[in-house]
Every structure is written in C-alpha cells, then in structure tokens.
From Swiss-Prot:
GO terms for molecular function: 5S rRNA binding; structural constituent of ribosome. The lineage of its organism: Bacteria, Pseudomonadati, Pseudomonadota, Betaproteobacteria, Burkholderiales. This is Large ribosomal subunit protein bL25. It comes from Polaromonas sp. (strain JS666 / ATCC BAA-500). The gene is rplY. Keywords: Ribonucleoprotein, Ribosomal protein, RNA-binding, rRNA-binding. This is one of the proteins that binds to the 5S RNA in the ribosome where it forms part of the central protuberance.
Length: 227
C-alpha cells in the first residue's frame, strides 16, 4: 500500500497547530540507518488510509521527494473527540531485520461448524489480533483461521493453528498458548427467550387475527337461558 508524504521544515507545538489548520498532519519517520525525518501528510488522504486494515498491519511504501521508502505505521495520535489525526509515526523497514507486529485474525466457517450448526453453541472470538515476528517479506496483512471443525465444549489455541511460512508467535504476559476461540453452550432459558423473541418478531396478519378473535368470542359465548 502506498502513500505520499512531504518534508516538514518546522517543528514544535505552534508549528504543528498551524499545519493542522491547513489540512495537513505532522509526522515523523525514524529507525534504520538514517536520521529521523520530519514529515507531513494530507489529512484527507490519511483519514481514508487509516480506515483500511492493510495500513495498520503491512509494510507500506512512502513516496517523498521522488523517492520511495518502506515503512511501518508505529503510532497514531487521534483527537479526543474530533475526526482528526493529530500526529503519526512511521518506522523504516530493513529487509534483513525481523519485525514484531500485531496482525488481525480473520475467522471464517463457524456457521458451518458442528458447534453452531448441530449443537447450537455460541462461538466467542477471544482474540482478534496476534503478536507475531517475521521478516518484512513474510509479514501477512492478516491470518485466516477456519473454524469449521469446532465442536461443543472445545476451544482453539495458538498452537492449534498453522501460521504462515516464516511467521512466529510472540508470547505476551507469560501466555505461550493463549485461547483464540472458545465455545459455550446456550442455556435452555436463553433458547426459550430467543424463541419467544423470534415469535414476537413475526408480523401478524390482520385478517387472521380478526378471524381468530371472532372464533374465540363465539366459543366463549353462553347459550340463551331456557324459559
């Protein structure tokens, strides 16, 4: 994924504030063998870019001054209540140095699994991203995990999945095999509530309702007393 950046001449709080007024976002590029570079980006283009998953979890190509440089998004500072990026940080990428990144997990197939289709269980996505280590060329935009084999009472751990070639899981907080997905049974009470809610959501035919009411009234009417 590519984006365009421009060299930034001034730094400081005042200069950054004036830059934002003109529709630009201040940033910095650091790492590698070069010195840190002050940059600025068009805020409108940046705002659309940050909505894409690939912008957060893949090696990016930054075009600046007629040259292209490979970088990673490392930090994004947002305004507390405005839709505005206040500052952005990028790190240069060395093709020979391993990266440590968080990549999204894409789950699929759970609707066809025995746990859901046969046993009517709930599937809980415990983790939605995973910390990994790899060379830049091996960095995946996401990791696809098929849940078609899930069964009642089971769970899926990191060691149960096959990571892409060249990718290693990075343990955090002493958890070397965290749970990715868990399966829980739905209680009978919850099933009854769901069925009642579904029945209540079915639209009522006015003619059928009127006919049913008339039939009920007729059945409940008392016969006239004999003289």
């Amino acid at each position: 994924m590519k984006f365009v950046a421009f060299e930034r001449a001034k730094q400081g709080t005042g200069a950054s504030r004036r830059l934002r007024i003109t529709g630009r976002t201040p940033g910095i590029v650091y790492g590698g063998t070069g010195e840190p570079s002050l940059i600025e980006l068009d805020h409108n283009a940046l705002w659309h870019a940050i909505k894409k998953e690939a912008f957060h979890a893949s090696v990016l190509e930054m075009e600046m001054g007629g040259k292209t440089e490979k970088v990673l998004l490392r930090d994004l500072q947002m305004h507390p209540f405005k839709q505005q990026v206040l500052h952005i940080d990028f790190q240069r990428v060395d093709a020979r140095t391993r990266l440590t990144m968080k990549v999204p997990l894409h789950y699929s197939g759970e609707e066809e699994s025995p746990a859901v289709k046969v046993e009517n269980c709930l599937v809980n996505h415990v983790l939605t991203e995973l910390s990994i280590s790899c060379l830049p060329k091996d960095l995946p935009e996401f990791i696809d995990i098929n849940l078609g084999g899930l069964k009642k009472g089971t769970s899926l751990h990191v060691k149960d999945i096959t990571l892409p070639k060249g990718v290693k899981f990075v343990a955090k907080g002493g958890q070397d095999n965290p749970v990715l997905v868990s399966v829980s049974a739905v209680s009978e009470e919850a099933e009854a509530d769901a069925a009642a809610a579904a029945a209540a959501a079915v639209p009522v035919d006015p003619k059928a309702a009127k006919a049913a009411a008339a039939k009920e009234a007729k059945a409940g009417a008392k016969p006239p007393a004999k003289k």
